[in-house]
Swiss-Prot record:
Keywords: Cytoplasm, Lipid biosynthesis, Lipid metabolism, Phospholipid biosynthesis, Phospholipid metabolism, Transferase. It comes from the Bacteria. Pfam families: FA_synthesis. Its EC number is 2.3.1.274. GO terms for cellular component: cytoplasm. GO terms for molecular function: phosphate:acyl-[acyl carrier protein] acyltransferase activity. It is an enzyme of class 2 (transferase). The gene is plsX. This is Phosphate acyltransferase. InterPro entries: FA_synthesis, Phospholipid_synth_PlsX-like. SUPFAM superfamilies: Isocitrate/Isopropylmalate dehydrogenase-like.
Amino acid sequence: MYRIAFDVNGNDNGVAAAVKASCQFLKENDNYEIILVGDEALINNELKLIENIPNSLKIINNPNVPSDVKNFHKSLRENTSMNDSIDLVAQGKADAVISSGDSGTYLACATFKLKRLQGVSRSAFMPLMPTIVGRKFLLLDVGANIECKSEYLVEWAKIANVYARTLLNIVNPRVSLINIGTEDYKGLEIVKEAAKELKDNKFINYIGYSEPRYLLDGVADVAVIDGYGGNLVLKSLEGAILSFKNLLKDKIMAKPIRKFGYLFLKGAFQDVAETLDYRNVGAAWLIGLNGLSIKCHGNSDSKAYLGALNQIKLVIKNNVLEAIKKELNDKPHE
């Protein structure tokens, strides 16, 4: 039986989405147990709306959230649902933790409690991203580290390489560094240094630099960048996708003839929307820790949470954490 600790207090819209997704996941996976950590009264109110509640759904009552997300030291000491959830993994009582709470607080608490893996200098946030060709790619770091060194980029590439084999089902993932151009002489020194080391790593399929504008074309399976640039790339891609959807909708609704034509193209438009829907992947992994940890959007709905839970299932099933430890020691995967 595998166990997932779920901090349900961090969602902007309450606990309903987390409860619904958890019940759906457990009905489809009878070898899992989910421990909902949050306001028990609110959780039970939502459970009243669900038929056939799985017996493998457990509750730990803790209605508290961090009182000051800018004060990480204070957050570490507080009795919160986030800390309780992470503690379950740290104590070996759960196999993974999931939360929608404040990103900085989650990063600090998870890093302090779970500890970094040997050979890892810094943790990083790593979401699965959609492309227009249907396949997905891993983007990291998207905000955990504003300042960066070349060794961080190399370490993250090694870790993401393992995740990509499992989450993307690719034997030899294409690993790339995001840069302002594809030429070797372009970019910051830390990027050039990381590129040289990745080229020399015989266990990584390093394909060179990738420009941000081509990421949605599926040019790489793993795209690595510092946290500052990665956060800008993430928000730019998410914003561009959303703006495109809204623009397309406005143009269709602007004229009656276009509305009529939409009736015949509705299926194609829905396919495009589904392909670019971030909720299908649901979350960002907090990588580099000695424990599985995943962070969801603060406004996640049940579809996004279910996507995150299914990612956790894949990673647990394929024993990714142990594979990462081997990768960090430059040992080939089996």
